[in-house]
């Protein structure tokens, strides 16, 4: 558990094997309003065989909130700078939602840094215009009321109906609601604005030659199956997997399914090297 100065921000990261140069590296990039914690179950599962690095984007989790630098291009530059600072030449890159926006840009602009690309609950398109007014209202509510007051409204965006209804997941729901409520107002507003205002990169996906896995929850309302299918059709040779009973946060909702699908994909990639 450390922080490192990346561009003009102190970036928080966790590194399971900071001194191990023998293992292949998996880098995990989280979604909007979350942090590296959303990959706890993946890091625990994969750290025996891989060096696992999970980090918090600026303004989120335990990373510093800065005045600017929240557009997807800047976050991509931050991520490459983090890899450089940690001495990571190549890695398996896993990005969920906003982390997937960044992951796709890395694959397009810095393909030499990737062993593989895994995209979870994400999109290559700009924000759907019909969603923008609702997100603007959400930002206004956060600005005036704070994250704690609006977090209950965010839960159905982040999680599917299976997770939200399961009695045995009550403690999990309470834990992740608390994580949402802990978001800092300033960082949340800046990061959300960066997501809303992002440019689409769909037309560039054909340039991606990196082995790619696309994962989507069958209950994902924020970036539904059709978004993942579009990416799948655009990236030659990519694989598409559906996680049953998961919404927009499959790493938390159905970690065993995600770990199995991701593990099988990584095993195949590792066999090529």
PLM regions with names:
Residues 128-133, 147-206:
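Conserved alpha/beta-hydrolase catalytic His-Asp/Glu region
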Residues 74-91:
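Conserved acidic catalytic loop of the alpha/beta-hydrolase fold
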Residues 95, 99, 103:
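Gly/Ala-rich beta-loop-alpha elbow adjacent to hydrolase catalytic centers
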Residues 104-109, 114-144:
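Flexible "cap/lid" loop of the alpha/beta hydrolase fold
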Residues 218-223:
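Acidic catalytic loop of the alpha/beta-hydrolase fold
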Residues 9-68:
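Conserved HGGG/HGGXW glycine-rich cap/lid loop of the alpha/beta-hydrolase fold
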Residues 238-273:
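Catalytic active-site module of serine/aspartate enzymes centered on a nucleophile-bearing elbow/loop
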Residues 208, 214-216:
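Short beta-strand/loop motif that positions the catalytic acidic residue
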């Amino acid at each position: 558990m450390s922080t490192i100065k990346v561009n003009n921000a102190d970036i928080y990261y966790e590194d399971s094997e900071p001194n191990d140069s023998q293992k292949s590296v998996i880098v995990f990039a989280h979604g909007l309003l979350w942090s590296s914690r959303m990959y706890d179950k993946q890091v625990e599962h994969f750290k025996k065989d891989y060096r696992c690095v999970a980090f918090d984007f600026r303004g989120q989790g335990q990373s510093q909130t800065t005045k600017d630098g929240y557009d997807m291009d800047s976050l991509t530059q931050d991520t490459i700078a983090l890899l450089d600072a940690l001495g990571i030449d190549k890695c398996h890159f896993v990005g969920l939602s906003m982390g997937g926006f960044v992951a796709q840009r890395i694959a397009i602009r810095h393909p030499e840094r990737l062993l593989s690309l895994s995209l979870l609950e994400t999109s290559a398109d700009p924000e759907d215009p019909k969603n923008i007014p609702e997100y603007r209202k959400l930002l206004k509510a956060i600005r005036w009321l704070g994250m704690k007051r609006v977090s209950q409204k965010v839960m159905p965006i982040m999680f599917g109906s299976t997770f939200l209804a399961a009695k045995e997941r009550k403690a999990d729901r309470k834990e992740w609601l608390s994580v949402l409520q802990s978001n800092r107002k300033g960082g949340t507003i800046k990061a959300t604005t960066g997501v809303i205002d992002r440019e689409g990169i769909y037309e560039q996906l054909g340039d991606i030659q990196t082995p790619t896995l696309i994962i989507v929850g069958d209950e994902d309302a924020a970036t539904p199956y059709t978004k993942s299918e579009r990416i799948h059709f655009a990236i030659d040779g990519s694989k598409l997997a559906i996680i049953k009973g998961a919404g927009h946060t499959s790493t938390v909702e159905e970690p065993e399914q995600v770990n199995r699908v991701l593990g099988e994909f990584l095993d195949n990639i590792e066999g090529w090297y």
